[in-house]
């Protein structure tokens, strides 16, 4: 069995039942590596002598040190949480317009989303290179902060985009460069899924994005997402208020919430051990002398595959309805976030890693990570091949103040420069080497098609365990509503 198949065998995802379901899929992928040989292709492209590419990388370094490093620091010192990133968007789009991009803001009804397009003077009859930019901050006990280094991701993209457009214009290479400004990576609903549903990514031939990390690591090919498949669900119980001394005149929504929360705990023993179900009661009533008539229970439901995840979600819906029935209250269910597996393409992962080694990226990890579908962009990566580039930019874990501080230090600045150069190198090769475009398209098309077969196989294998839920709907049940935000 080839290395690619062995890699897929241990990572599609991690449970015995998934490996059983994946068996037939793995056999079909076996011939894919023989045709493409992604590691060999990547090493050949990265190792070749190419003065034009090297000039592009030198230009990335000049743009980063001259403009983008200070922009990264500025965004870092002015953190804005998801859906509120107005200063960052104003600044980034002004720079892109100065670089010759045509910029649309408020895309797909999101005030802080934008798309910036540049077309080569040689024409648009070439590849469309997409770069995903993020800029939202985290909420923290000490105030909003860039503990995931999103402040650097957009300047990284802009440095790569600037160097590529200059090369394409000077060398008369046809094609387009598109920068997608995507807000709110850290909060629900998932903005990239909403942008995908609105058709914003339509027309892109490749997408690249970067993300901070404590190591430089490529992912294994296959199907997956960084943090398991997730349903973010709110259960709202509505009752009737009354004085607590005559509580029988009311309908206690808090009692319903507690009964539901307790029922979920009892259900855990009936679920596979890979399930991760975490919840809070953010709204539990106002005063102890009033029967609560409104409560909210907020859950993240996680599982390695979406088939069993939906089974868990349906059981929880039934438990919520039961709690409402017991207490004489009503319950409404809102799925405000949905994260699903994407497709990870070895041709791009290996190319990114080959350039990481060539450029001296710190913290190289030989062991590959699990398939991530360039993180929370799962549905996007099923349609458009892409790669998430991670270069070690901190010695502290993600979502920490230590990682925020490293954003402004040499460890961060150096990593961000290498990240920008890798993005530019991967896109340069995709632009100038039809062999790479063919390999990426073939691999992505095959994996995207096999993902459907894999999910159907999971339904068959799970059948006796989840019963009628084997015939799950392919349509999203999520209510992904854009929050209403006013510009300050």
Labelled PLM ranges:
Residues 16-147, 151-176:
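Acidic/His- and Gly-rich active-site-bordering loop/insert found
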Residues 49, 255-258, 262-488:
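Metal-dependent amide/peptide-bond hydrolase catalytic core
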Residues 130-132, 233-235, 388-394:
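Non-cysteine beta-strand/loop elements that form the S-adenosyl-L-methionine
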Residues 137-152, 171-292, 399, 483-487:
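Histidine/acidic-residue-rich, glycine-tolerant segments that coordinate divalent metal ions
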Residues 1-7:
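Sec-dependent signal peptide recognition
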Residues 75, 96, 116, 131, ...:
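Divalent metal-coordination and catalytic microenvironments
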Residues 60, 64, 68, 72, ...:
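Sec/Tat-exported extracytoplasmic proteins
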Residues 105-106, 184-185, 223-227, 368-371, ...:
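Short Gly/Pro-enriched turn/cap motifs at secondary-structure boundaries
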